[in-house]
Amino acid sequence: MLKKFFLPDEFVKNIFHITPEKLKERNVKGIITDLDNTLVEWDRPNATPRLIEWFEEMKEHGIKVTIVSNNNERRVKLFSEPLGIPFIYKARKPMGKAFNRAVRNMELKKEDCVVIGDQLLTDVLGGNRNGYHTILVVPVASSDGFITRFNRQVERRILSALKRKGHIQWEE
């Protein structure tokens, strides 16, 4: 059960290790990505210049991006709108509705999309439960909001169990 729900298909150090070339090899046409601690620190209001370049590179290669966040409308809108990136706020991840809505909005199929995030309990669990290819990234910041701090404690236990069972091939 742990493996089925909590083991991501891929693990990368950060979003910048996900390139259009690698995505094209998998025939990926769409990205559903978390915002806080995946793209930028949870308390950073705007995208970094490097992240803006990453978004532009995806767009140039025809890869659509939608931000799906459990955060509130104000936070997600203030970050996403200046970039012209579609978004879904209060997504209620790991529930699947927001993931599926993002795919419909991008006019793609589930098989054409990946889910990227920094949390096992929201991003990976939600993506895996709903049949998406999942990519776990190391959190951008070492600090978290209150609820996420609790989730991280649970995640450490899950990762430890997956590692003991030989399912994890990377170093944390």
From Swiss-Prot:
Lineage runs: Bacteria, Bacillati, Bacillota, Bacilli, Bacillales
Enzyme kind, highest EC tier: hydrolase
Q: Which Gene3D superfamilies match?
A: HAD superfamily/HAD-like
Which protein, by its recorded name, is this? Probable phosphatase YqeG
Query: Which organism is this entry from?
Result: Bacillus subtilis (strain 168)
Which key words are in the record? Answer: Hydrolase
Task: Indicate yes or no for the key word Hydrolase.
Answer: yes
Q: Which gene name belongs to this protein?
A: yqeG
The EC number(s) given in the record are 3.1.3.-
Q: Which NCBIfam families match?
A: HAD-SF-IA-v1 (TIGR01549), HAD-SF-IIIA (TIGR01662), YqeG_hyp_ppase (TIGR01668)
